[in-house]
Swiss-Prot record:
InterPro entries: dsRBD_dom (IPR014720), RNase_III (IPR011907), RNase_III_dom (IPR000999), RNase_III_sf (IPR036389). This is Ribonuclease 3. The gene is rnc. Homodimer. SUPFAM superfamilies: dsRNA-binding domain-like (SSF54768), RNase III domain-like (SSF69065). Mg(2+) binds at residues 40, 113, 116.
Length: 224
């Protein structure tokens, strides 16, 4: 019978030499004093470099602005959470009782952070070239389909440009609620937009993410 650890490693396309590193990468702050946040910090930087390097060589005639937007699309929390679900990481996360009860194994922010932590763990367990190969294998289809252009602009930028094009006032964002403990907060942001009857509400694990979520909803309403 295949063990859970082996199933996960097959999904990741990487066999760990250190089972302790793999376990640490899956351990949320709520579960243990020794958790994956340092690995997450490391993995975030490695991921950004690997994706930037690939885009630089993949698009030799694209300017810095478009490359930055493509990289942001590929390394954002939403994309990382999608990867986490593809790996079925929710089945392997080590969470405290509170996070388990609140469905933390489904939360985008926790899945995204875990993917970054796994990247950090693979780097420490192997080397730069090996972690590069793993990341590029995860991102192969996304890298083959991504293209420079307006679709890579974040929702706040697109909303601002949409309103400017219609000669309307810029949106106003207000934080209306912050819920949860310091390491696991949820922000609620209200976005007031000229042309919409009611403010739109966005939620996210940071103020910026909540604002982006609200802007995305506002765009959908303006375009409908």
């Amino acid at each position: 019978m295949t063990s859970p650890a082996n199933r996960l490693q097959r999904r990741l396309g990487y066999q760990f030499n250190s089972s302790e590193l793999m376990t640490l990468s899956l351990t949320h702050r709520s579960a243990n004093g020794k958790h994956n946040e340092r690995l997450e910090f490391l993995g975030d930087s490695i991921l950004s470099f690997v994706i930037a390097d690939d885009l630089y060589h993949r698009f030799p005639h694209v300017d810095e602005g478009d490359m930055s937007r493509m990289r942001a699309t590929l390394v954002r929390g939403k994309t990382l959470a999608e990867l986490g679900r593809e790996f079925e990481l929710g089945d392997y996360l080590l969470l405290g009782p509170g996070e388990l009860k609140s469905g933390g194994f489904r939360r985008d922010s926790i899945l995204a952070d875990c993917v970054e932590a796994i990247i950090g763990a693979i780097y420490l367990d192997s080397d730069t070239e090996q972690v590069r190969k793993v990341i590029l294998s995860w991102y192969q289809s996304r890298l083959e389909t991504i293209q420079p252009g307006i679709n890579q602009k974040d929702p706040k930028t697109r909303l601002q440009e949409c309103l400017q094009g219609r000669r309307l006032a810029l949106p106003a964002y207000t934080v209306t609620k912050v819920h949860g403990e310091a390491h696991n907060q949820e922000f609620t942001v209200q976005c007031e937009v000229t042309g919409l009857d009611k403010p739109v509400i966005g939620k996210g694990s940071s103020r910026r993410k909540a604002e982006q979520a609200a802007a995305e909803l506002a765009l959908k309403q303006l375009e409908s």
